[in-house]
């Protein structure tokens, strides 16, 4: 009941004198946005490990803060898994274990689904890891347009 909520919030504001803001929540961006990255290195540590340019701690904080495993575009249901991690020095910068569509290799693109709700508002530049660029995809003509990209000055300016 929207009108009852509006009336309640107006009464609360009048009683408390506080400004009240409603955060829209993830519903406005649920199932929207993908986070695309690249495998930078592959090695064996008892299982295949891939270091990516995507950081769980910097770009996907729910992976660390909550029991959350983001879905990956074109992930296979079976086969040998690779543990994907980020480039920061944080020991827990682990995205998770995934079965990639191809043999893992340096330069391989990966894409995580449903990332708009946090990859834009909770990102950080811990350890100098850059913020992800924001691109728009036009599904009618398959064109990509860069809306915003970030460089070292974005890191510097967040500190001052």
Predicted regions and their residues:
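Acidic, glycine-rich loop-and-beta core segments that form the ion-binding/anion-interacting portion
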Residues: 1-24
